[in-house]
Structures are given as structure tokens and as C-alpha cells.
Amino acid sequence: MAGAFALSRAVVWAAGAAAIAIAGLHENAESFDADGIARGPGAYWDSVWFLEIAREGYERAEDAAFFPLYPLLLKATGASVAGGVLVSLACFAGALWLLHRLVALDFGDDVAGLTVLLVAIFPAAVFFSAVYSESLFLLASVAALYGARTGGWALAGVAGGLATATRSAGLVLLVPLGLLWWRSTGRRLRDLAWLALVPAGLGVFCLYLELEGRDPLAPFRAQDAWGRAFAWPFGGVVDGARAAWEGARQIAAGEPRTWPVYDPAWVDLALFAVLLVTLAAVVGALRRLPLAWSLYAVAALALPLSFPADGQPLMSLPRFVSVLWPLHLWLALVVVERPAARRARAPAPSIAREIGRST
């Protein structure tokens, strides 16, 4: 775990610093408080929203899309990029450590170590060391599932509530947690009662908004301000395919590219490629993993894929996938169990063993 954490974060930070040194900071860098090589790689698009909420509270309707636990931690550490990065790094280290323990319960240290490594080197893992809530959500969600898997229902409920106070996706933890309770010995109602804390994280957020004189239902409406609307279950798959097809058409036709930061045609193609790989991993997870883990991945994917974004249906999909560790677990099993895959990634099992020994 320590090796995966240190190596992956060093690579992310070095790459970000090199990019800043070569290309310079974005024109809006001052609003991120990212004024140099040392702190710049920790600030991305949504970082400014988290920082402004930490400093000023929920002033705008669209702010409610960012749930309060991470901004509260930012505020406690000075509402700065440096403080936010430290929070994210600490949460990510804890998440990897706990994830190793969770996976090792069923699959052993080698698979657990490789799973941790794959989570750490996933392309969208850059957000785990940035001023984003991904690290905190990963820690809280893994803690909730670890608690349920080991019979610690108080931990499952409290951590699940913290996950829901971090991101709306915390609500889907009720799917694997409910299944684990159903399969537990005795099915005690007092254990089930702890799971009521999972939606309580959202309830507390709504109550806070009400007490502040703001719309208590803003968390349910905020996605409208970001161009997301319900299509139909997994409707984003079809919309993403259409966007990718249109992007391919534009590129093939040589239409002029006008966006200053990135090319949406290529981005739509890349996002659709991520979707195809993700869906393949979901199928593999359903066939190979415990049902609670695979259903968690399906339920968590259902949220962004059922609420596609206007103009770019699969927006942020890699970031959503980054916290879906069951998909990384499935890939780890493929690498460990199949000789051809093992030869293709020869160093990975030995690295996984070293990670396992250091945990």
C-alpha cells in the first residue's frame, strides 16, 4: 500500500509540475490559490467551487451539487489548496490501507495489493491528490463496506453517512450494505438500524440549508444548473454513443476546432472508449466478484449514466469510475489468474506481493 501510494502520487505531482513549468498556469489560477509549481497540480476545475464553499458557504444554487463534508474539512485546514491537498492525501492513504484489508479478506494479499496498485495508477487517480472529494468518498465508502463485511454495523452506518455527506453517490451504498445485512448471520434488526445513518448524511445537509434560509431541496435540483437531467436508466450510454459518433464525424470532416482548452470531439470519443472498457469490467465483475461488490459498481454507475450532461453526456465518467474499486479488483483477478495476462503485466504480481508485505 505504501509503495503504491508514494509512487503514484510522486508521478502525479511531477507530471503536474512539469506541465506547469512548460505550459504555465491557467489564466484563472489565482482564483484557485494555485500560484506555483508546488501547489498547482493540486487544483483542477471543481477545486475552485470547493474552496469558495469552504470560504463563503453555499451562496449560489449550483453550490449544492458539492456536498458539505469535504468543504468542512477544507475550512478546518485553512480553506487553501495546500490544506485541501493534505486532506486528500491523508484520505487516499487511509482508503488504500483499508481497501487492502477489505479485498484481502476474500482474495488474499496478492490480489489486494494489485487492486490497490490499480486504483492508485488509474488515469483519473490524479484527483485523489487534488482539491476534490474523491479521496474522502473512497475512504468513507470502503470503510462502510469493510464494516459490513466484518460485522461492524456501527462503522458501516457511520461511514456510510459520511460518504453520503460527501457525495450523493453515497446513497447507493445501501445496495451492497443491505445485501450484506440480508446475508449476515441472524439478520438482527439492530444491525439494520445502523444503516439508517446512510441517508442521514443527505438529510443533515438538507436541514442545514433549511436553517440557513436556503432551499432544503437544492441538492436534488443542483444538477439542473450543471446541465444534467434524467434521461432513463443508463440512457447516458446511448447519448454517449451518439456524441462519440458526432465527434468522429467532425474529426473525419476536418471541421475547425474552436475550443481553447480541449477538443470536445476527441474528448467525447475518449469518454466513450472509457465507457466501453468500464462496461466490459462490469460484466466481468458480475461474473467473478461477490454479488455485493458487483452490484455496488452497477448501482454507482447508474447515477451518472442515467443523468447525462447536456453537450457532453459522459462528462466526468473517468472520475466517477476511479472510486469504483470492484472494477479494479476484477482486473486484478484477471492479471493474477490468467497466464497470458500475467505475462503481459509481468511486474505487477511481484509488486502486489511487495505491497501486501508492507501493509
Where are these regions (language model features)?
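Short hydrophobic/aromatic helix or loop-helix immediately within or flanking a transmembrane segment
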Residues: 41-79
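Loop-to-helix entry region of an early transmembrane alpha helix in multi-pass inner-membrane enzymes
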Residues: 64, 68, 72, 78-94, ...
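Transmembrane-helix motifs of polytopic, lipid-linked glycan transferases
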Residues: 76, 86-106, 277-281
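Specific aromatic-rich, kink-prone transmembrane helix
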Residues: 98-101, 118-121, 136-155, 174-177, ...
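Transmembrane and membrane-interface helices of multi-pass
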Residues: 93, 106, 113-124, 128-130, ...
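Transmembrane-helix signature of polytopic, membrane-embedded enzymes
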Residues: 99-121, 155, 290-291, 295
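Short acidic/glycine- and proline-prone juxtamembrane loop motifs at membrane-interface regions
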Residues: 130-136, 317
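Membrane-lumen/periplasm interface segments of specific transmembrane helices
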Residues: 11-29, 41-43, 162, 174-277, ...
